[in-house]
UniProtKB/Swiss-Prot annotation:
Region (Disordered): 155-191
Keyword terms: Lyase
Function of the protein: May contribute to degradation of proteins cross-linked by transglutaminases by degrading the cross-link between a lysine and a glutamic acid residue. Catalyzes the formation of 5-oxo-L-proline from L-gamma-glutamyl-L-epsilon-lysine.
Enzymatic reactions: epsilon-(gamma-L-glutamyl)-L-lysine = 5-oxo-L-proline + L-lysine
Full protein name: Gamma-glutamylaminecyclotransferase B
Similarity annotation: Belongs to the gamma-glutamylcyclotransferase family.
Gene: ggact.2
PANTHER family: GAMMA-GLUTAMYLAMINECYCLOTRANSFERASE, TROPONIN C-AKIN-1 PROTEIN
Biological processes per GO annotation: modified amino acid catabolic process
Entry's EC annotation: 4.3.2.8
Keyword presence, ATP-binding: no
């Protein structure tokens, strides 16, 4: 089974870890902790404070994370979740595993990195490890929270537009819980 290195919100204790252990997404088995053999820039940026590993080997810091063995279904889910290849790119990376006796072993695993990014991202602070609640003060903004605020705004817009449409037509279509449509006609103008 393929190995995947996670360094950000998919790590244990981080906001998206639940996606990695959700069996409906596929199977993922924790193997060990590791760090990149080469330094990479791990930056936190964007409206949601997303951690990105920029595919610029030799720059930044050696990054700590976790290696998981995943089945094909989980790999496909991760590609979808990471919007690969449009948003992130899945590439192979060399990782160093520290053994209990002080020796190291090198393993190769897939990692989701950014090859396309804003030029100023290379000037952002880099990190060797990610924690959403870290000292950096850049807490990850849950996608669900962002979606909820977007939905709340769309709902408010919809309600306002519906009210205007009702006043215009003096009728209202109501969808009941059984899914039946009912037309309600008003005898006078709505106030």
């Amino acid at each position: 089974m393929p190995l995947v290195f996670v360094y950000g919100t998919l790590k244990k204790g981080q906001p998206n870890y639940f996606r990695l252990i959700d069996s409906s997404n596929g199977q993922a088995e924790f193997i060990t902790c590791a760090r990149t053999v080469e330094p990479y820039p791990l930056v936190i940026t964007g409206e949601c404070n997303i951690p990105f590993l920029l595919n610029v080997p030799g720059s930044g810091q050696r990054v700590y994370g976790e290696i998981y063995s995943v089945d094909q279904k989980m790999l496909e889910f991760l590609d979808w979740f990471e919007e690969c290849p449009d948003w992130y790119q899945r590439t192979l990376i060399q990782l160093e595993i520290l053994k209990g006796n002080g020796e190291t072993e090198v393993e190769e695993a897939f990692v989701y990195t950014k090859t396309k990014y804003e030029p100023d991202w290379l000037n952002k602070p880099t990190y060797d490890s990610y924690d959403s609640n870290g000292d950096h003060g850049l807490k990850y903004a849950y996608e669900e929270d962002m979606t909820r605020s977007t939905l709340d705004q769309k709902s408010a817009d919809f309600s306002q537009n519906s009210e205007q449409e009702i006043k215009k037509n003096n009728s209202l279509q109501i969808l009941t819980s059984t899914g039946d449509d009912h037309d309600v006609n008003f005898r006078g103008p709505l106030q």
